[in-house]
Amino acid sequence: MKSILDALEINKNKNPDKIAVLCEDRELTYSELYEYSDRLANKLRQIGLVKGNVVALMFPNIIEFVISYFAVLKAGGIVLAINVIDDVEDIKFILEDSNVRCIVYWDKFKDLFENVLKRLKHRVSTVSLGGKDLKDQLSYQYSSGEMDDKYKRIVIEENDISSILYTSGTTGSPKGAMHSHKNFVLVSKIWKELVSITPEDKFLAVLPLFHPFSQIAILNSCIWCGATLVLHPRLNIGETIQIINQNNVTLFFDVPAILRLLLNKYEQEKFEMPSVRLCVSGINSCSEKIVNRFEEVFKIPIIECYGTAETLFIASCSRIGRERKANSVGFPIKEVEMQIVDENDSVLSTNEMGEILIRGENNMIGYINHPELTCKVFRKGWFYTGDIGMEDEDGFFYVVDKKFEVIKKGGFSVYPSEIESVLMENEKVKEVAVIGVPDDTKIEEIKACVILNDEITSTEGEIIEFCRSKLPFYKCPKYVQFFDSLPKSSTGKLLKKLIKDRLAKV
C-alpha cells in the first residue's frame, strides 16, 4: 500500500458498516467516511486545489477534522493541521511559512479564521464545515448529482508529501517537518506491531488531532488497522472517564499531564477503566512515580515512547512483557538506529551524556522552505535531535534534556530535568520548570519556577533547602519564584522559552 488512503479503501470494502469514527452523539461508518471525504475532495478540486498544494485544517477533535484530513489527501493536497489555541500571529506565521493555498475550517471558528485571514499576505481558498447535520451538509453542499470523474481520483505516490508537522518552536520560530505517504505507512505499521492493534480496538483521541503525535499514533494507526476512533472534543477529566467507559475504549494514547489528572481524580473519587488494555504515553517524559502509581491503581500497563515531529514521534519505546527501567524511553524500534555523540560528533560509550541522533525511514524529508536548516540537522543520514541523553549497557536510552536548556554553571553542565524530578518529590509542589538565568557574576544561575498545590504555602528558602538535602550544591537553585500558572503547549508541556521571555519583561 502506498498511502493511508489505500487502507481506508480496503477497510471500506471489507467492513463498510463498521464504525470508523464517533464523537459524542455522531458517528461515521467506514463507508460514510470514504464517501464524505470523496465529496469534500471533489469540492477542493473544483475550487482550484492542485496536487502538492498545502491545505490547512482548523478544527477541534470532531468528525469534520477526520473527513477533511482524508479529503485533502484524496485531492492530492498536503495536510497542515493548525493548533487552534495558538496565538493569531503564530498561526499567521505558519500559514505564510508553508505557503498555504486553502483553509478548511469549522464554522464555529469563524471569528478566529477571519482574524487570521485578514493578516495574511497572500490569497487563499476557503471551505467552511459545520452548522448543519453532517450528512445533509455534505450531501447538499458538496454534491451535484454524480461526482465528476475528472476530480474524483488523483494518483498518489509513496514519496509524495503527505503532511507538514510543525515543531513547537521551543528554540525559535516553528519549523514545518515534511513527511511522505511512505513515512506515514511505515509508522502506522510500526504502531500496529508495537501495541498489537486489531479492528476490534477503540482508540481514544483526547489529545488534539492537530498535534503531530495524535495524527500519527492515533488517527493514522487507527484507520490503517480498521479500528474505531473515539473523539473527545475537549479535555474535562470527568467527561474523559465517562467517554472511555461508555464506549469501551481499549487504547489510550496520552501525555503525562493527563495521567496526573486521572490520578488526581481517582484520589477524589475512585473509578475504574476496565476496557482499557493499554496506555501509551508520549511527547513528554513521564516520572517513574506517576507510571508506577497509574499501573498500580488502574491495572493498565503503560508503554512510553520517544521521538520528535521530525521522526514521526517514534524512535524508541518500552515494551510490554519486557524489562523496563526507571526514567528510560526504552530501546530503539527495529526500523530505527539511535546513537549518542559528543560536540565533535564522536560516538560516546555507554552511560556518557551527549546528543541523541536518529536514523531511519521515519525521518522527515526536510523542513519546508528551509533547506539550510535541513542541512544543519541532517548529517550522513542521521537526524540531530537537539536532545541530550545517554544509552546504558543494556541498550536502554534516556532523554535528559534539550540541548539548548542545559545550564552552564561554573564549568558544570546542569540538566534542569534532574532538578525538576527532585522538586516533584516535594508534596507541596504541583509543577516546576527549572531554567538558567544570567547572574551578576556573568555566569548562569539556576532558577526554579514553581507552582504550589492548591491552598499550600512555601518559601524560597524552604524549596532551596529541600534541593540541598537531595542534590549536590552546584545543582541547587539559587533563585525560586512562585507562580499561579506557567505557559504550556496544547499537550501540557511547559514552554521554557516563553517562561524566560516572561521573566525578561518583568
PLM segments and residue spans:
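Conserved ATP/PPi-binding loop(s) of AMP-dependent carboxylate-activating enzymes
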Residues: 331-335, 346-377, 414
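Conserved pre-ATP/AMP-binding loop-to-beta segment of ANL
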Residues: 17, 128, 145-166, 173, ...
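AMP-binding/adenylate-forming catalytic core of the ANL superfamily
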Residues: 103-105, 252, 360, 365-366, ...
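Conserved AMP-binding/adenylation subdomain of ANL enzymes
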Residues: 185-202, 210-251, 261, 265-266
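Conserved AMP-binding A3 loop
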Residues: 29-31, 162-186
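Conserved AMP-binding/adenylate-forming core of the ANL superfamily
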Residues: 4, 17-62, 66-70, 87-92, ...
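Structural core segment of the AMP-binding/adenylate-forming
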Residues: 46-47, 74-140, 454-456
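Gly/Ser/Thr-rich phosphate-binding loop
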Residues: 249-254, 263-324, 337
